[in-house]
Amino acid sequence: DMGSWDIYASALVTAPSGDPQYFFTTSCVPGMSYNFGAYDNPEVTALIEQLSREFDPAKRGELAVTLQQMILDDNAYVFCSFLQMNMISKENVKNYTAHACDYYQVTVDLDIT
């Protein structure tokens, strides 16, 4: 029940594929799964729709920056931290490179000898 709390804290890996659309689609569109605060800005929703139809990486980046600023200006979200990750492996794991998004940690070069 969204009316029963004053503040909500959540941790979310926002870019499992390195693309910003996941966060905007799930958290900034009315009725979507992670939009717990019922955020609703028709201009933001329209830009998210535009983002879903845009395939040029540079234009997608520009749209993402614009969307970020709009939700910050609306005070829709307060981004307060970033998870510090620790990596531990056995000595026989070779070519493992830590990355801020776990999607990129398993590569063709990763090997267990």
Language model regions located:
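Bilobed periplasmic-binding protein-like "clamshell/Venus-flytrap" ligand-binding domains
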Residues: Y8-A11, F55-K90
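Extracytoplasmic/secreted proteins, especially bacterial periplasmic and envelope-associated proteins
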Residues: S4, D19, E43-Q50, K59-T66, ...
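Periplasmic binding protein-like
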Residues: D1-C28, L63-A64
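Short, solvent-exposed loop/beta-turn-alpha elements that line the ligand-binding surface or hinge
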Residues: D1-G3, F23-R53, F82-T113
